[in-house]
Amino acid sequence: MISDANTASSPATVAARFVDAITWGEHTVVWQLLSGSGRSVAVSVALANGLDRVVAARISDDVADPAEFDDFLRQLIRGLRRDLRSVDVSELQVGSCVVTGGVAVAHLTTPSVIPGTDDWAAGRLRLSMGGGGVWTIDRLEPIVAGP
């Protein structure tokens, strides 16, 4: 799905928009920014966490009831925040972004709490260029520290 959320020209811009959407709970923007692969992973994780198979199929086929789809997206935001639990999501920043062909890796950082030290790595976003030159999010790979 191409929308205003993901028509930005650079993977770093799309990655920053994705981080902002997680921070502010913009669940529909998060979904719009996910690639087909990213959406499949999100539905698979939800299935493993108890999502009904019929609901999952409707979500995958883009025919879900608006209320069940909204509930799924809210759970997705909670899951992404849980994945990033070792950092304050409101302080996440997109650092370097390495592009190789139609694939990009955006490195996520968070400010260090120790004076005089560099930002800390918080994870990576893997992106791919889809049809029409649109960058989308394939996967969040958090660096988890703590419980």
Where are these regions (language model features)?
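Short secondary-structure boundary segments
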Residues: 1-10, 83-91, 98-99, 121-125, ...
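Short, low-complexity N-terminal intrinsically disordered segments enriched in polar/charged residues
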Residues: 1-45
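Intrinsically disordered, low-complexity regions enriched in Ser/Pro/Gly/Gln/His and often acidic
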Residues: 17, 24, 65, 128-129
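Amphipathic alpha-helical interaction segments
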Residues: 26, 39, 77-80, 143
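Generic preference for flexible, low-structure residues
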Residues: 34, 43-46, 50, 85, ...
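Surface-exposed, charged secondary-structure patches
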Residues: 50-118
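Short beta-strand edge/turn micro-motifs at domain boundaries
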Residues: 95-147
